[in-house]
Structures are given as structure tokens and as C-alpha cells.
Amino acid sequence: MSTFFAKANAVERKWYVIDAAGLPLGRLATEAARILRGKHKPTFTPNVDTGDHVIIINAEKVVLTGNKLDQKMYRRHSGYPGGLKETPYRKLMQNMPERAVEHAVKGMLPHNKLGAQMYTKLKVYRDENHPHQAQQPEVWTIQ
């Protein structure tokens, strides 16, 4: 019996919705990245995008353990001397809670073109409203 290799055009993609209310950020991001990569499927192939679409709702209700709410910083650099910008997690959650979840999930995907392609299938929303009802997403529960 030969090894199975998935074909990119033969992959059937489903839509899953994850409710982030009360979930730790890391556990939510790990599970979302797992679905985006397709590791939950028996047809997983590392060099092919076999993953499904993920909708994360209630991003503003995600939690961090310990003192990370005050100590965790998001950093970016403009490339110029002295161009380091730091944003505390608490401020980011007040202004753009979707960005914190997207950043965590993106860090758990491959850092190449395939990872960028997987990242496009992630949709994050601040509250429980999302415009993807037509795709009939299944609810994915995280213990």
C-alpha cells in the first residue's frame, strides 16, 4: 500500500465556529491553528493546505492567566532607529480584541507561503455576530 498524498484541488473544506468566551488565549489559538492546518483530518499532508475555515466569535471575552493582562506586550518595529512600538495587552483588548487572537493564531501556523494561505481562512469577530451563516458552520467545542 502506498502513502496517501492529498491533492490541493480535491480537499473538501468545512466551516467551523469557535466561541472564545472564557477560553485561555493559547488553548484557543492552538486549536484554531490545528483546524486551519488540517491536522484533525486523516488526510493531513504537511505540504498541502488541507485545513478548514475557522470563525472565532466573542474575541473580546478571551482570557489570559496570571499577570499577563498587565505584563504582556505586543511589539512591532518600523525599521528606523528608535522605532520600536509597544502596545500593552490590556489596551489592545480594549481597542482591537480581534488582533490579539489573530496574532496568537498566526504565530502557531507555518512561517511560509503555505502558512499565509492557511491564515486567510481565519475569521475573527469581536462579538457573537458574524456574516458567515450562509456557509452553515459547525460548532467546534474546546474542553
UniProtKB/Swiss-Prot annotation:
GO terms for biological process: negative regulation of translation; translation. Pfam families: Ribosomal_L13 (PF00572). The keyword Ribonucleoprotein applies. Disulfide bonds: none annotated. SUPFAM superfamilies: Ribosomal protein L13. GO terms for cellular component: cytosolic large ribosomal subunit. Keywords: Ribonucleoprotein, Ribosomal protein. It comes from the Bacteria. One of its GO terms (molecular function) is structural constituent of ribosome. NCBIfam families: rplM_bact. Part of the 50S ribosomal subunit. This protein is one of the early assembly proteins of the 50S ribosomal subunit, although it is not seen to bind rRNA by itself. It is important during the early stages of 50S assembly. Belongs to the universal ribosomal protein uL13 family. This is Large ribosomal subunit protein uL13.
